[in-house]
UniProtKB/Swiss-Prot annotation:
Subunit note: Monomer.
Protein name per the record: Porphobilinogen deaminase
Cellular component, GO annotation: cytoplasm
A Pfam family that the UniProt record links to this protein: Porphobil_deamC
Species assigned in the record: Synechococcus elongatus (strain ATCC 33912 / PCC 7942 / FACHB-805) (Anacystis nidulans R2)
Length: 320
């Protein structure tokens, strides 16, 4: 009896250029590791891709860039989905898990400037310079350090945002360095913003692959892409965010590092106007990263983080 060939593995992806570059990288790595298997990409648009005329914080962020892919996984239409980990909620739908975290690229935020500001760094931009960002996290931290700058919401994919900058709608943009690097646009990075000024988003720079919890075949395939140090760092970050009941659209930032078996997690919570900014740090063994995230959340809550976040949740309510 001749055995039937293994079924194709279906990978879910958003349709944006960055999402496809990331998904095709995963597809290529799996094809290289498992040359006898077939990996097909299926694309779909998410709510976050479709609604471009409303600030992200006003839409709400529960599955904004992931829900449609998750529905497809639960329906058996795709086997796993590739996400920018920073877009993946810390609480996943029942039946789905974070199956793999890939090696992280530079998680820093980057300053991209219009040509007329090419001789400036972030700290030398003149009063009234218009900075484009859709992130409340970046907004709050930059307002804290540079209250003389002006900030304006910017939506759309990376190419759209850069086109708006080049057309003069903005003087500068704050973007994720990893996204620019993955799209071969590293030359647009004018300055990497130091962690002392802007802590990055939870999971920024890493890819998170979401799959069905009860799918041992897929989980086994994904093991080959897991990068343990990145996973440990991101587990700590995600536990911190989850405990604070924050999403990707609140002013919560992190930074993590591993040295000699010790993981150090720095976290930040800020008010929208940037006037109140809480920042603290914990260190501990890499063997229990989630415990570190929970400990740091408790420390910041004791300093008033919950009150700051409650005010934000009352102010920035998702539109119906």
């Amino acid at each position: 009896m001749v055995s039937s060939p293994a079924r194709p593995i279906r990978i879910g992806s958003r349709k944006s250029q960055l999402a496809l570059v990331q998904t095709h990288w995963v597809q290529g790595e799996l094809q290289r590791l498992y040359p006898d298997r077939q990996f097909d990409v299926q694309t779909m648009s998410t709510q976050g891709d479709i609604i471009l005329d409303v600030a992200l914080a006003k839409i709400g962020d529960k599955g904004l860039f992931t829900k449609e892919l998750e529905v497809a996984m639960l329906a058996g239409e795709v086997d796993f989905a590739v996400h920018s980990l920073k877009d993946l909620p810390t609480r996943l739908p029942e039946g789905l898990i974070l199956g793999c975290v890939t090696e992280r690229e530079d998680p820093a935020d980057a300053l991209v400037v219009h040509d007329r500001f090419k001789d400036h760094q972030l700290e030398t931009l003149p009063e009234g310079t218009v900075i484009g960002t859709s992130s409340l996290r970046r907004l709050a931290q930059l307002r804290h350090h540079y209250p003389h700058l002006q900030f304006k919401d910017v939506r759309g994919n990376l190419n759209t945002r850069l086109a708006k900058l080049d057309a003069g709608e903005y003087d500068a943009l704050i973007l994720a360095a990893a996204g620019l690097q993955r799209l071969s646009m590293a030359d647009r990075i004018h300055q990497l913003i130091p962690a002392a000024v802007s802590l990055h988003a939870v999971g920024q720079g890493a890819l998170g692959i979401e799959c069905r919890a009860e799918d041992p075949e897929i989980l086994e395939l994904l093991k080959a892409l897991e990068h343990e140090p990145t996973s440990q760092r991101c587990l700590a970050e995600r536990a911190f965010l989850r405990e604070l009941e924050g999403g990707c659209q609140v002013p919560i930032g992190v930074n993590t590092a591993i040295a000699d078996g010790t993981l150090t997690l720095t976290g930040m919570v800020a008010s929208l106007d940037g006037q109140r900014l809480l920042r603290d740090q914990v260190s501990g063994p890499t063997s229990d990263p989630e415990a570190l995230g929970l400990a740091l959340a408790a420390q910041l809550k004791a300093q008033g983080a919950k009150e700051i976040l409650d005010e934000i949740f009352a102010t920035v309510r998702p539109e119906a």
